[in-house]
Design a protein with these regions (language model features):
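Residues lining hydrophobic/aromatic ligand-binding pockets adjacent to catalytic sites
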Residues: 1-224
Length: 224
């Protein structure tokens, strides 16, 4: 069985979903430390001014050493209203804005205590939208070993996985020798996003899946 492991990501780019679609099981790594400036609570959409960050505010005071699954969302910032305005301005002319607006309204109307819960909710939504049937689960809440490679090995062994589809950035830290010694074959997921029609000028890759969802009816995973 081949698995993939990734931290939660708010409205992730298409490559996040592509990696999930190519494995037998996906594990969301939410019991590790929250990283400032990551994609856990933000991503980019395309506006008339180019790529633009939209962010879910979180309460980090007193939580900087806490796990992602423990970091609360800051609902005092009225972020749902801000996102609604940003999405309206960016995508009101998009091909699928009309048919997708109600789903967005329903999703944004749900309340979540933590950023991990929010990311889980959105992940379930995107998997259904794009007919990706890969089962997924949250990571174990405790580790018996330190180190990134060792943690990955432990998760693989817990799931009896003999294959691991790694993200390209894991080349910087993944110990391939330890993985091989543990009987886990490693592949790297080098993803090239599809080019699709966008508003506001030349194509910009690497945006949130929201951009592709709004601009095209194409499902690259159903058609691959």
């Amino acid at each position: 069985m081949k698995i993939a492991i990734n931290q939660p990501a708010f409205m992730p780019w298409p490559g996040y979903l592509d990696r999930i679609a190519r494995v037998d099981h996906f594990v969301m790594m939410d019991a590790v430390q929250f990283e400032r400036g990551s994609f856990i609570n933000r991503n980019r959409i395309k506006t008339q001014h180019g790529a633009h960050w939209f962010t879910v505010p979180v309460k980090l005071k007193g939580h900087t050493q806490n796990r992602i699954c423990d970091v609360p969302i800051d609902d005092t910032r009225r972020w749902q209203e801000n996102h609604a305005k940003q999405i309206l301005h960016a995508y009101s002319r998009a091909l699928r804005f009309g048919e997708n607006s109600k789903a967005l309204e329903l999703m944004y109307g749900c309340k979540h205590e933590t950023i991990a819960h929010l990311c889980c909710h959105w992940l379930s939504f995107w998997l259904v939208e794009y007919a990706i049937t890969t089962p997924w689960s949250l990571m174990p809440r405790t580790f018996t070993v330190p180190g990134k490679t060792e943690q990955i090995i432990e998760i693989c062994q817990a799931l009896k996985a003999d294959g691991y589809l790694a993200g390209p950035l894991s080349r910087d830290y993944l110990d391939l020798g330890k993985m091989e010694k543990s009987g886990i074959a490693v592949e790297f997921h080098d993803y090239t996003p599809p080019v699709y029609p966008q508003l506001w000028g030349p194509f910009i890759p690497g945006l949130s899946i929201l951009d592709m969802w709004m601009n095209t009816e194409t499902n690259p995973w159903r058609e691959s």
